[in-house]
């Protein structure tokens, strides 16, 4: 049958062949346009459903049915309450981090006097020389190398600032006593085992602050 069709096609006049070809192309174009039309309609429908879903997801409790609104409102209130509570927690952390500010008035005065001497007097020069020699003599670490390679004035300032930080770490609370220092040392001991430079600085800070704690 296929051979008969082929024979008929060969015998067909050329103008009829052109007509049939044009008709075939027209049918293909119509079929393609219908497919595109169906796709565009489907896309519009999907967009509409997505838009409706988004609007439904952003519905406020006031537009929901009463039973659903009752379920959502406690969650909203809990979230607002946690947001109000958070600054208070942050404030507590800041109070702990502002080391030295919680010391008794007498200890606080002695602490600030000591820190001032470190930055402005011969005590500070003696401190940085002692720290430099101890760090130079210790086992080499990345931190010790970093400090030893600093320019002298920058190194002195860094060592003084690190000492001040340890002083404020050790001297805090209503009144710092020896047992308080022991507890704080135990807290930072694991850190000091890894940071030998900090251990050296902490020991010198404690040596300077011992008279304040024993006061």
Curated annotation (Swiss-Prot):
Q: Name one Pfam family in it.
A: Paramyxo_C
User: Where does the record place the region Disordered?
Assistant: 12-34
Q: What keyword terms does UniProt attach to this protein?
A: Host cytoplasm, Host-virus interaction, Inhibition of host innate immune response by virus, Inhibition of host interferon signaling pathway by virus, Inhibition of host STAT1 by virus, Inhibition of host STAT2 by virus, Interferon antiviral system evasion, Viral immunoevasion
**What are the annotated GO cellular component locations?**
host cell cytoplasm
Q: Which residues does the annotated region (Involved in self-degradation and in host STAT1 degradation) include?
A: 15-22
Post-translational note: Protein Y2 is produced not only by alternative initiation, but also by proteolytic cleavage of C'. Only alternative initiation is detected in vitro, whereas in vivo cleavage seems to be predominant.
Q: Which family does it belong to?
A: Belongs to the respirovirus protein C family.
Q: What does this protein do?
A: The different products prevent the establishment of cellular antiviral state by blocking the interferon-alpha/beta (IFN-alpha/beta) and IFN-gamma signaling pathways. They inhibit IFN-alpha/beta induced tyrosine phosphorylation of STAT1 and STAT2. Blocking the IFN-alpha/beta pathway requires binding to STAT1 in the cytoplasm. They inhibit IFN-gamma induced serine phosphorylation of STAT1. Block the IFN-gamma pathway by binding to and stabilizing the parallel form of the STAT1 dimer, further inducing high-molecular-weight complex formation and inhibition of transcription by IFN-gamma.
* Subunit and interaction comment: The different isoforms interact (via C-terminus) with unphosphorylated and phosphorylated human STAT1 (via N-terminus), favoring the formation of parallel STAT1 homodimers. The different isoforms do not interact with host STAT2. C protein interacts with L protein; this interaction has an inhibitory effect on viral transcription and replication.
Miscellaneous remark of the record: The C protein is found in virion at a ratio of approximately 40 molecules per virion, presumably associated with the nucleocapsid. The P/V/C gene has two overlapping open reading frames. One encodes the P/V/W proteins and the other the C/Y proteins.
UniProt remark on domains: The disordered region at the N-terminus is involved in C protein self-degradation in trans. This self-degradation of C protein may play a role in the regulation of viral RNA synthesis. The disordered region at the N-terminus is also involved in the host STAT1 degradation in order to counteract the host innate antiviral response.
Protein name listed in UniProt: Protein C'
**Gene source species:** Sendai virus (strain 6/94) (SeV)
